[in-house]
Every structure is written in C-alpha cells, then in structure tokens.
C-alpha cells in the first residue's frame, strides 16, 4: 500500500503541487493524503487521465460520471474522494472563461475535404461552422501563469466576499443595467451553468466573463411599480454586476406560424448546443397584454401566449410523489389536475412531464393509452356536425405542422382541452408496479365497507376497460356478484328493479349503508328471532330433525326429546339381550360384562370379574442369609460349613449330591 502511494505521488507530483497551490490561493486546504487517494481512484477507474494533469472542466466532469458508474457497479468510493473531486472541479471552473479552440486551419487537410464533400459548400465561412470531429472541444490545459486566483475563493466560498466587502468584477461596466427583483452579487452566481463550448465573440464589444442561465429572453420581467422590482426593495450594491434586463418574447396567435417565437426557438437551440436542457421544459401560459409599441395606438388588450419553464420544485414534488405514493394516488391526481387546468399544456409539455416523473414501464403505459385516446377522439371529431378540424398529429404533437414548440404554442383552445382530457385519462390508467390484477378477482372482505369495495372495483375497471358503457355494465355486475353475503342480501331486492335514469351503484351503496355496525347486528338478531330478514323474506332451515322428523332444528335441539325419552331409551338399551352366546364363557346368551361363570364351556377356570387388590411388590432373593429348614430326624448329623450369604444359593445349585442336613435349632 505504501509503495502504491509513493508511486502515485511521484507520477502526479507536479500536478499535485499545482492543485495544492491553487486550492490554497482560494482559501481551501486539502491534505496530501486525500489528494493521493483521489488520484489512486482516478488511476483505477479512469486510465485515460494524463500524467501531466489537465485543467479542462469537461475531463473532470467525465471523471465524476465514471466514478458514479463505478459506484453503481458495487465499487466503494470513499466520501473524501467525492469531496476532493467537487472542490477541484469548482476550483477549475473560473479557468473556463478564456477557452482556446482548435481552429479549422490546424485540422488535417482531409477534415476540410470531407466536410466539403458532405455538405457541398465551398466557402471558408461555412466550412468553419461545419468542421468535423477532428476539430476537438476546447483544450484548457494551457499555461497557468496568468491565472486570477482572486476569483477562486469567491467561486468556492461566495459568503467570504460578504465578510470582506469585496468581490471580483465579472461583468464589464457596459453591461450594467437595472436588474430584476432578486439582485445577487456576481460572485454568487452558480458557475455550473456556464457554457462549455466555444462561442464566437464580437470584437467590437468587450467579452463577458460569465453567461448566465436562463437566457436573456427567458428571464423574469419585473413589475413596473418599482424601479427595483417591488416597493421597499433596497437598491443594488455598488460595485456589483447586475443581471441585464431582458425583453419579453410574446407570441401572437393571429400572426403566421413561421414568424412566431423565432427568437425563443433560437435561444432554446443554442442552449441545447451549450449544455443540458432536459430539466427546463416549457409550458405555454396565456396573459392579457396592453397595447404598446408592438400594436397600433388605441388597440384594446388582447390575449397572448408566453412560454415559461417548469419549476424544479414542481418536477421534484411530482417525481417524489409518484415514487412514494404511486402515480394515481389522490395527492398526485390533485397536483396533476391543478397543473393541467392552471396552464395551457401542449403535447410537448405532457410528454416532458411524463418522462421526468414516471418510470420506463409507466411512461410506456401512458404513451399507449394516450395514442388510444387520440384515435377515439379523432373518430368523435369526424362524426361531429360540423366536423371539428383537429387531427391526430395535433393531439399527439407530431407531424410537420405540430412537432415544434412554436407550432404547438399557437394551438386553439379546443385542441388544448382535448389534449388535457386525453392525457389525464391516460395518466389515470397507469398501473403501478405489482398492482395489476384481473377485475373479477376483486372481492369484498367480510368486514370491508361496501363503498370501499366499490371504489376498488371502479378504479380497476377505469384502468383496464376503455369503453364507458362496457365498464358501467361490468361494474354493476361485479358490485353484486363479488359482494359479501350480507351486502348481497341487501342488494338482491334492488337488482334489476332500479328505475331508468338512476345510478345503480348509488342505490346499492344506500342499501348497504350501515351493514356491519352494531345497529345492523342488533336488527339481524331481532329479525332472526321473528324469522325475518332485511329483504322481507323468511329464511328457512333446510335440514330435518332425526328425532321428530320436523324441519327447522336438529336432533340435539329437538324439543320432543326430553329427559323421559332419554331414560326410556337407556332402559330399553339395557334390557336388550344379545343375539349370540357370551364371548367369555360361551355357555349363555348374556353380555360379557354380565357373565358370572367361573368355568368356561370346556371346564377351564375363568378369571373373576371382581376387582383385585393392589399387586404386591416383588420379593428380593439373595440379599439376606439363607436359612435352610432341617427336619427333626437329622439333628445328630454334622452341620454344613458356613456359606457366604450371596454365594450359598449358587453353591447349592452346583452340588450334585444332597448335602447333609443341618441340626435343627432347639425348640
């Protein structure tokens, strides 16, 4: 491990020294150990990283992407590595203001020839704008002698500028104009939104150090009642570069489509070339514009369209809500309805909102139901008298006439309303992962309220059945067939008897109101005693009593089977004689438990039927000395030798001859 550290330190020695000096000038201190660890990780997962280092911000962004990809594969990236990478990336951002691009003259000759052959253009001006891949992106690893280190601390820690009361002048004096409602020091502007590609500068004007997002055409227009945006707002700090005041782009629906929003569309295309624009979606908002320079004098106010971006907070709320609660939860549906009815969402807006909020499978479902709804709506438009001139391309935002934002922004109100209804219906049919099941498998639980069961049934039918009439019939059928027995008994008198024009499901819910509560249970008990039910029908007991033969009760609860009947049956059973001989003695026709014979039919003794006493414990042999009985006539004989207590029995058994009798004890 120590050899690896020393090898990495020697390999990137000059670059490490420069990075440490760069961070120190900016007021940041990073230990050499952490930097060596960072470059070890870079060397492991980014083998393309040059030994002499690089100041190109795109290279460090690429390092971050590859480290993220390595982390997704299961590799452990220490937290200090991420912190050091972010600090170095932020420290290198000020160096991207003066970019050096490779000119077309420095490219190989085959590059220009290939470009001319592909495009068919011979002018040098057009060739410069259409150079191929040999003209690389800006190379930033140039000389570091002219670095302005005073900007670095303001970029990494902008709050220090407030404490010191100073900041770098990032915008020339010619750019100073009254700013919007939220003046910020130029040092606090986020530098992550700077363009990374080379832009051809105008030599007649001084170059601007930073370009801000959003573009000038999309920035906020301050209200006219105050010079600084709202009453009581303090003036801008002296010596700080304000935001330039942008003009507002307005689209006239009555004008031709070719001239609508040309500046806006050009800004969007340029922003896409300079950076990622996926999070900045555009929606169309109607506003009432007073007569001004753009219109004739004395003209009344007219409604015009204005494009505004989706806020990041709104996109984040929808994304987190879909992930946590589901795409069709009440929270998401309420939020989506408010967005849809509060704005003029074009097909491009709906597609962008679905892509940024739904998963891949959910977006595929949304797109499928969207296309299906468009086809049905087009058939309705053609069948209407007079015919509505709204085709499928307009509702889907496709085709040569409706594929761009400019073209969709001037859509008529009726088309916007149809797109809104179709997309909301398609969103409602999205199945969350793991929740798809057939509608006939939805059954009411024994204790589930009937309205909850009907709500689950309608929700599943809404997502799986497109036709409204078929969905209504199936819901009414399943609302009775899949209900529990209590609700079925309450609904049965209403089935097929609901008057025309009255909602069947509503009548079912009214009939099942209160089922399962304490009052309903008390009513059931009272009606069971009277033989009635909720529907007014007598519920009879179908089984027959085996004792009396009547219907309505069992034998164990038969009122005829009283105590006297039980005694009589017991006496009859006792007096009944067996059909064969006694199995014990074999001599008479009586029961075995009533047999008193002492001998069987063959004369063999039988064990008595009387109860015996408790059995005696077994006697122990050999534990005490054996005292043999000596008859009286053998008292003169010589006594036997003394035998040990435990061996006397075994020696007597081994003796072949009869031993001499022992003298009897005196009487």
From Swiss-Prot:
A zinc finger (CCHC-type) spans 543-560, 580-597. InterPro entries: B_retro_matrix, B_retro_matrix_sf, Gag_p24_C, Primate_lentivir_Gag_pol-like, Retrov_capsid_C, Retrov_capsid_N, Retrovr_matrix, Znf_CCHC. SMART domains: ZnF_C2HC (SM00343). The keyword Transmembrane helix does not apply. Gene3D superfamilies: 1.10.1200.30, Human Immunodeficiency Virus Type 1 Capsid Protein, Retroviral GAG p10 protein, Zinc finger, CCHC-type. The products of the Gag polyproteins of infectious retroviruses perform highly complex orchestrated tasks during the assembly, budding, maturation, and infection stages of the viral replication cycle. During viral assembly, the proteins form membrane associations and self-associations that ultimately result in budding of an immature virion from the infected cell. Gag precursors also function during viral assembly to selectively bind and package two plus strands of genomic RNA. Endogenous Gag proteins may have kept, lost or modified their original function during evolution. This is Endogenous retrovirus group K member 5 Gag polyprotein. It comes from Homo sapiens (Human).
């Amino acid at each position: 491990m120590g050899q690896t550290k020393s090898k990495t330190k020697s390999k990137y020695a000059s670059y490490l020294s420069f990075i440490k000096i760069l961070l120190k000038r900016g007021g940041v201190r990073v230990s050499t150990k952490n930097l060596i660890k960072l470059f070890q990780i870079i060397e492991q997962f980014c083998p393309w990283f040059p030994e002499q280092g690089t100041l190109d911000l795109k290279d460090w962004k690429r390092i971050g992407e590859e480290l993220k990809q390595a982390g997704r594969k299961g590799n452990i990236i220490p937290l200090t590595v991420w912190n050091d990478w972010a600090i170095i990336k932020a420290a290198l951002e000020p160096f991207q203001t003066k970019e050096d691009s490779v000119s077309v003259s420095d490219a190989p000759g085959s590059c220009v020839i290939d470009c001319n052959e592909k495009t068919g253009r011979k002018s040098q001006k057009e060739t410069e704008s259409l150079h191929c891949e040999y003209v690389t992106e800006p190379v930033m690893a140039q000389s570091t002698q002219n670095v302005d280190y005073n900007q670095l601390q303001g970029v990494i820690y902008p709050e220090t500028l407030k404490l010191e009361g100073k900041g770098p002048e990032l915008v020339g004096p010619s750019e100073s104009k009254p700013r919007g409602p939220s003046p910020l020091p130029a040092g606090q502007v986020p530098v992550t939104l700077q363009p990374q590609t080379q832009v051809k500068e105008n030599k007649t004007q001084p170059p601007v150090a930073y370009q801000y997002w959003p573009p000038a055409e999309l920035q906020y227009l301050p209200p006219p009642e105050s010079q600084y945006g709202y009453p009581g707002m303090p003036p801008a700090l002296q010596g700080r570069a304000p935001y330039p005041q942008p003009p507002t782009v307005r689209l006239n629906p009555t004008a031709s489509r070719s001239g609508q929003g040309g500046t806006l569309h050009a800004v969007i295309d340029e922003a896409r070339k300079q950076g990622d624009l996926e999070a900045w979606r555009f929606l169309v908002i109607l506003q009432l514009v007073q007569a001004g320079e753009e219109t004739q004098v004395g003209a009344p106010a007219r409604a015009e369209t204005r494009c505004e971006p989706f806020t990041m907070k709104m996109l984040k709320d929808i994304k987190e809500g879909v992930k946590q609660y589901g795409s069709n939860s009440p929270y998401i549906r309420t939020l989506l309805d408010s967005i849809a009815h509060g704005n003029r969402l074009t097909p491009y807006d709906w597609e962008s909102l679905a892509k940024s909020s739904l998963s891949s499978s959910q977006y595929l479902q949304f797109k499928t139901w969207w296309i299906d709804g468009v086809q049905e709506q087009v058939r309705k438009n053609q069948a209407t008298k007079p015919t509505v001139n709204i085709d499928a391309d307009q509702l889907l935002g496709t085709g040569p006439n409706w594929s761009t934002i400019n073209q969709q922004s001037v859509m008529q109100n009726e088309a916007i309303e149809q797109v809104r209804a179709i997309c909301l219906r398609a969103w409602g049919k999205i199945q969350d992962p793991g929740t798809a099941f057939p509608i006939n498998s939805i059954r009411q639980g024994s204790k589930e309220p009937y309205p909850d069961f009907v709500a689950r049934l309608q929700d599943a039918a809404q997502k799986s059945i497109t036709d409204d009439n078929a969905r209504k019939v199936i819901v009414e059928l399943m609302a009775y067939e899949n209900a529990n027995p209590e609700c079925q008994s309450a609904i049965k008198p209403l089935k097929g008897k609901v008057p025309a024009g009255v909602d069947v499901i509503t009548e079912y819910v009214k009939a099942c109101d209160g089922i399962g509560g304490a009052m309903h249970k008390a009513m059931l008990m009272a009606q069971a005693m009277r033989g009635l039910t909720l529907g007014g029908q007598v519920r009879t007991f179908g089984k027959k009593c085996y004792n009396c033969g009547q219907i309505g009760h069992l034998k164990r609860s038969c009122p005829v089977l009283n105590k006297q009947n039980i005694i009589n049956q017991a006496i009859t059973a006792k007096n009944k004689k067996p059909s064969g001989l006694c199995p014990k003695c074999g001599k008479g026709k009586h029961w075995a438990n009533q047999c008193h014979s002492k001998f069987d039919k063959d004369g063999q003794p039988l064990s008595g039927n009387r109860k015996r006493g408790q059995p005696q414990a077994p006697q122990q042999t050999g534990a005490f000395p054996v005292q043999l009985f000596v008859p009286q006539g053998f008292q003169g004989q010589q006594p036997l030798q003394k035998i040990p207590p435990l061996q006397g029995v075994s020696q007597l058994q081994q003796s072949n001859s009869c031993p001499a009798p022992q003298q009897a004890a005196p009487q």
